[in-house]
Each structure stands twice: as structure tokens, then as C-alpha cells.
């Protein structure tokens, strides 16, 4: 039976900051870094295989974000909980902020969630993460170090049976000049690099770029790497090497 409250479940810190004194203007964020779900929630009713799948986290994104942080000497904000508990790249009003279904998977532990349990996730995970991201941006703006906000994500080679042709994509709203520089640099390889593909930034469905970037006049993009390119340490380092000069 689902508990009416989740008070005390979220003992792990909601985020970690890697390289807090990084000198790069790039500020990295990895909202879907972790698949961690507190033991009390029994994987939200998912079996082990589903709980390891891309629905729970962005496979390889954390390793890539850490590699970029090291190469660029950039600060990185890392989320410590699964996106299935609450998606940190969704406004709270978005229908899938706490998803009841994800692709082909029902999420039993999110169905019929009480207002108290929902608020516990908001207060324990969502609000502290976004408060910290706001503070990191504030610090840079106050020091007249205009940041470039870069979200690091991954996507699946196939979605609902349809093959995705891109090896990577860059998603953006108002930061078209910055985004196009990155896209142009990556396209020098001759591979398919998506411009606002495989997703499109939508202020009603996205948080990082519209709220922390566009609304504040900060250049902000999401980098999406197809996750079959991030399955090995060599793949991660290859992508970090390719991305770093253009960020």
C-alpha cells in the first residue's frame, strides 16, 4: 500500500557541486544524473530492469558532465535523485513533473500520489536544487562573470520503435548564437547533429533553459548525446573532447 506521506524518506542531499571554484564561464548542470530512489519507495513499483532504464535517468550523462567539468575547469551541479521522483527539468505545473507513465512503463508509485507526498518531493528535491542553481548564477552575474549554462543529457537511439538519426543534439531558446556555434562545430565531423532535435525547448515543459537561462538573459543550452555513444569510458572521453572547444 502506498504511504500517504514520504516524510523522512529523502535523507540524501538533493544535489552535489563538483569543482565549486571552477574558473570557466561555463556552468554545467546534470538534472537527470541519478537513478537513486529511496529504499522505502520500493523502486516506485518498477522491476529492476525498468529501474535501470533511461526512464529513471540519462544514461552516461553524469560521466560526460564530470569529464567536461574536468576539461573546462567548470563548476557542475549534479542532481542526486531519479527523475521519476520529480523531474528537475520540468516546471511543477507540467503533467510529467512527477510522471505516472514514462514511455511504455506505468509508474505505480506515482499514481494516486497524495498532496503531502508530492509536496515532500518538491520541498526535499526540487526547491533546493533550483535554489542552488539560482545562487550559482547569481554569484557569477554579481561578479560580472556572465555564465554560459549547459545542461548535459542523453537520449535513446530509438523512441517508441522509431530510430533517431542524430548522434547528438543541441536544444535552445533565445541563445541561438551560442547554440549555433556549438552545432556548427560538432557538424564538422559530418555526423547528424540536431538543432532543437530530438526535443524542442518549451517554456511549459522545460525548466533549465527557459527559467534559469532565457528569463535571466543568460546563454543556456541543453546538450543531448545519444546514449549508445556514452556506454564506455572511451565514448565519454571522445564526446567530452569534441564538445569542450565549442562550449
Regions found by a protein language model. Name each.
Residues 1-149, 154-247:
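N-terminal catalytic or cofactor-binding beta/alpha core of small enzyme domains
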Amino acid at each position: 500500500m502506498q504511504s500517504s506521506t514520504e516524510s523522512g524518506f529523502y535523507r540524501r542531499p538533493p544535489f552535489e557541486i563538483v569543482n565549486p571554484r571552477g574558473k570557466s564561464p561555463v556552468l554545467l548542470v546534470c538534472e537527470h544524473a541519478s537513478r537513486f530512489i529511496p529504499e522505502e519507495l520500493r523502486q516506485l513499483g518498477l522491476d529492476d530492469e525498468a529501474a535501470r532504464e533511461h526512464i529513471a535517468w540519462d544514461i552516461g550523462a553524469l560521466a560526460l558532465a564530470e569529464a567536461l567539468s574536468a576539461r573546462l575547469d567548470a563548476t557542475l551541479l549534479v542532481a542526486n535523485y531519479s527523475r521519476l521522483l520529480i523531474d528537475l527539468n520540468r516546471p511543477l505545473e507540467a503533467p510529467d513533473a512527477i510522471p505516472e507513465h514514462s514511455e511504455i512503463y506505468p509508474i505505480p508509485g506515482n499514481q494516486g500520489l497524495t498532496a503531502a507526498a508530492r509536496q515532500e518531493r518538491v520541498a526535499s528535491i526540487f526547491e533546493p536544487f533550483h535554489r542552488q542553481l539560482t545562487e550559482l548564477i547569481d554569484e557569477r552575474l554579481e561578479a560580472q562573470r556572465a555564465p554560459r549554462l549547459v545542461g548535459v543529457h542523453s537520449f535513446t537511439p530509438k523512441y517508441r520503435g522509431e530510430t533517431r538519426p542524430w548522434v547528438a543534439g543541441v536544444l535552445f531558446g533565445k541563445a541561438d548564437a551560442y547554440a549555433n556555434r556549438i552545432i556548427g562545430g560538432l557538424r564538422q565531423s559530418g555526423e547528424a547533429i540536431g538543432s532543437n532535435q530530438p526535443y524542442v525547448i518549451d517554456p511549459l515543459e522545460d525548466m533549465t533553459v527557459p527559467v534559469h537561462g532565457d528569463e535571466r538573459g543568460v546563454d543556456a543550452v541543453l546538450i543531448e548525446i545519444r546514449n549508445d555513444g556514452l556506454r564506455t569510458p572511451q565514448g565519454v572521453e571522445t564526446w567530452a573532447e569534441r564538445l569542450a572547444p565549442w562550449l
